[in-house]
Design a protein with these regions (language model features):
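C-terminal motif of bacterial Sec signal peptides marking the signal peptidase cleavage site
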Residues: 27-29
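Detector for the c-type heme attachment site
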Residues: 69, 386, 677-683, 706-707, ...
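Extracytoplasmic beta-rich repeat domains
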Residues: 96-107, 137-166, 194-210, 226, ...
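Flexible coil segments in periplasmic/lumen-exposed cytochrome c-class electron-transfer proteins
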Residues: 644-664, 671-673, 680, 713-753
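Gly/Gly-Pro-rich "capping" loops immediately C-terminal to redox-active cysteine motifs
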Residues: 667, 679-717
């Protein structure tokens, strides 16, 4: 039976291997025709970036020094060779195959003609930025440690993604999924130093975010607040750029049941229940957004959601639970708290504040203010004084119903619409937020922020209080989150999750399509939307991050494979390039030998590991081949597309003698342990109804699930949570679902004939 809305948990993976290459001669995916027959430059310097060069990036507009180009993190390029008058001539230049089939979320860094990009597990690709020829590649799975283990993939909430590298002083810094931080020689890709950043490997920590550099430090956070029985306790670690020696560590939430070691943790502890359950670590991971102000020497941390989501379980007596869902400023020299602002006090909805932040100088109230801007998940746009943390303005940038406004102290006023303690509630925005990790962009010319907005509700369920058949889902704790589309049918899920809102209740709210993605041009001074363009609907969601340029252009990739180019001032669509690949990352722009290029990483996955590929997504139509795509004026008219996806028919499933009770128990166990990665349909992880690799044999199936037989491919062992009887019940459920799919396939074929 096809489910017409999705249960979102959060990945597994497919195997890939890359080899360090000493020579720059290797197969590049494809190349477009050149506008001129001029031999491209051969790079002569590698990673030659210091803080002064980064801070004065506008003197070198052809470089893209960091994830957001410069130290402001604005994802804005001063280049204008490609502009609103000639962008119709933008065409394909070259592509590089990453040999992956998962989400790719990084914006490449380009320095002196060399492109540095990261991929799944924390792999790094150094390429000639003109031709795409590989200079070297780095695979953390070949460096010892746990980088290739399935446990790291099992603990990753949202695929085995990586959001970027940092480049400084001839080194490329990257973190692997299992939490090791590497400093690589920018010329060769060989490790200069490495360090394990994880404090406790018995907890489900992973790392997917990019390192943040200060004057002399590399700062890295982690993830894991959604996983296991009690998640993890968030922190960031700062290491010496040259040696890798740890200089300080900042925790974001107090440790349960222990005396606190710092003034900021003592203050935070007062906002938590002193008798809280020590199994629950608290969460607050810094899994993505960070920023740095060199003049103030402050590191800004975007702190994430709670562990678990439900505050009644996490901190029964209530409280704001600092520093969850906060923007936190830390002194880069001492590692001590400078200030904090909490966006969602006592967060119950996975409304972390981990989204990327932008530093800007804005004319507000008759003077120029040094601000930090963020559009976090909760639906409010924040403009804060970045020296003091004082709010300057806070305004909703999308529809929300969890809050009915702000009080005089800029604290959100909670509405009863989002209290799911007494029954499931339809809540806006959904857990992916009004805006997730996909970068927004600030254009200093238009003074507009371009936000990839997600407009969707969620139905949030307290499983125990709703008398559900399951009381825990890995990746969601004691809650379940359903994201309804226009064909929402609650009867599909009632057997597992109990009573649910009826269809008419879901269709209230914004008055627009229930689930859609919108690109919005937001004026942070006037606090309003200037223009908006719907980019996707019918549940493709998760379109790409945004880049703006001095050519009056805004670039955004989409899940359906389109790379769209808009006029920055009006939002008029100027150019569409069909790539055949789902795009989640933000593009970059750079110039080499007088030619401007636009590059973007393409590969669908990430949080969509928790759902089948939407029917109108590129990943449902084409193979989800990971690529770096590069474009220039007078490039090729057609961008090569991946091969079409061809599904083999369901094979007759193996015979079994399972009882209805065993199958029903297997359905519950599958929902609790397997469903956040393995969906029935085309998805990132395999559809288990399509038996293969010997898993049609019960003994082999047990070895895969309990012993980690396929750990090298990303399928970790579950012996800590499942028994042999549990696995047999899961297999019975899968075989039963395979039998239904095989039967339905035959009936469709018979009807067609």
């Amino acid at each position: 039976m096809t489910k017409t809305f999705r249960l979102f948990g959060r990945g597994r993976r497919s195997v890939f291997a890359v080899t360090v290459l000493a020579a720059a001669v290797a197969l590049v995916g494809c190349s477009g025709r050149a506008g001129k027959s001029v031999a491209p430059s051969v790079p002569t310097t590698y990673g030659r970036v210091d803080l002064a060069r980064l801070l004065h990036a506008d003197r070198e507009p052809g470089q893209w020094f960091a994830g957001g180009r410069d130290n402001s993190g604005g994802y804005y390029s001063p280049l204008s060779q490609i502009n609103d008058r000639n962008v119709s001539g933008l065409g394909f230049a070259w592509a590089y195959q990453t040999h992956t089939s998962r989400g790719l979320e990084m914006t490449p860094v380009v320095v002196d003609g060399v492109m540095y990009a990261s991929g799944n597990w924390g792999a790094v690709y150094a390429l000639n930025a003109v031709t795409g020829a590989p200079i070297w590649t780095f695979d953390p799975q070949k460096q010892g440690g746990g980088g290739g283990s399935g446990q790291a993939a099992r603990y990753a909430c949202c695929d085995v993604v990586n959001r970027g590298v940092a480049v400084r002083d001839g080194k490329v810094f990257v973190a692997s999924l299992d939490g090791r931080l590497f400093a690589l020689d920018a010329r060769t890709g060989k490790p200069v130093w490495r360090v394990d950043t994880i404090v406790d490997h018995s907890l489900p920590y992973t790392v997917s975010g990019a390192p943040q550099l200060t004057r002399d430090l590399v700062v890295i956070g982690n993830a894991g607040a959604d996983i296991g029985v009690g998640g993890v306790r968030g922190y960031v670690s700062a290491y010496d750029l040259a040696t890798g020696r740890m200089r300080w560590r900042f925790y974001t939430v107090p440790k349960p049941g222990e005396a606190q070691q710092t003034p900021e943790m003592s203050a935070a502890a007062k906002t938590w229940d002193p008798k809280r359950d020590p199994r629950f670590q608290g969460g607050g991971t810094v899994w993505d957004g960070m920023a740095y102000d060199a003049d103030l020497n402050l590191v800004y941390l975007g702190v994430g959601n709670s562990s678990p989501y439900n505050g009644h379980d996490r901190s029964p007596s209530g409280g704001d639970n600092l520093y969850l869902s906060s923007i936190v400023a830390v002194n880069a020299k001492t590692g001590r708290l400078a200030w904090h602002y909490q966006t969602t006090p006592g967060d119950n909805w996975d409304y972390g504040a981990t989204q990327k932040m932008i530093l800007a100088d804005l004319p507000i109230g008759g003077r120029v203010r040094k601000v930090i801007m963020q559009a976090p998940k909760n639906g409010y746009f924040y403009v804060l004084d970045r020296e003091t943390g004082k709010p300057i303005s806070i305004q909703p940038y999308t529809y929300l119903n969890w809050s009915k406004g702000l009080d005089r102290n800029f604290r959100p006023i909670f509405s009863g619409d989002a209290d799911y303690s007494k029954g499931p509630k339809l809540i806006y925005p959904f857990w992916g937020g009004g805006h997730d990790w996909q970068p927004m962009s600030y254009d200093p010319r238009t003074k507009l922020v371009y936000i990839p907005v997600l407009e969707s509700p969620m139905i949030m369920i307290d499983l125990k209080r709703n008398r559900a058949a399951v009381d825990h889902i890995d990746g969601l704790f004691g809650t379940s989150i359903l994201v309804p589309d226009k064909d929402y049918r609650p009867d599909d899920w009632r057997p597992l999750f109990g009573k649910l809102p009826k269809g008419p209740a879901v269709n209230k709210g914004t008055g627009k399509e229930t689930v859609r993605a919108v690109l919005k041009a937001w004026d942070p001074i006037a606090r309003k939307t200037i223009w908006s363009r719907q980019s996707s609907a019918d549940y493709t969601l998760f379109d790409g991050g945004v880049m703006s340029t001095a050519g009056n252009l805004v670039f955004q990739g989409q899940a359906d494979g389109k790379l769209q180019v808009y006029a920055a001032d009006t939002g008029r669509l100027l150019k569409t390039i069909e790539t055949g690949s789902g795009i989640m990352a933000a593009p970059c722009a750079y110039m080499v030998d007088g030619v401007q290029y636009v590059a973007v990483m393409a590969g669908y996955g990430g949080a969509m590991v928790g759902s089948p590929f939407p029917p109108n997504s590129a990943a449902a139509k084409y193979q989800n081949t990971g690529r770096i795509l590069v474009f220039k004026l007078d490039g090729a008219a057609e961008t090569p597309k991946p091969p079409l996806r061809r599904l083999q028919p369901f094979q007759k499933p193996p015979l079994q003698a399972a009882s209805p009770e065993q199958i029903a128990e297997g359905a519950k166990l599958y929902a609790s342990n397997c469903g956040r990665c393995h969906h029935f349909g085309v998805a990132v992880a395999p559809d288990l109804r399509r038996f293969g690799d010997g898993t049609d044999d019960p003994a082999t199936f047990r070895r895969v699930v309990l012993d980690g037989l396929m750990a090298k491919g990303g399928m970790g062992a579950f012996r800590d949570t499942l028994t042999s009887g549990d696995v047999d019940a899961i297999r019975a459920y899968v075989v039963d679902e395979a039998r239904k799919a095989y039967r339905d396939q035959g009936e469709r074929a018979k009807a067609a004939s």
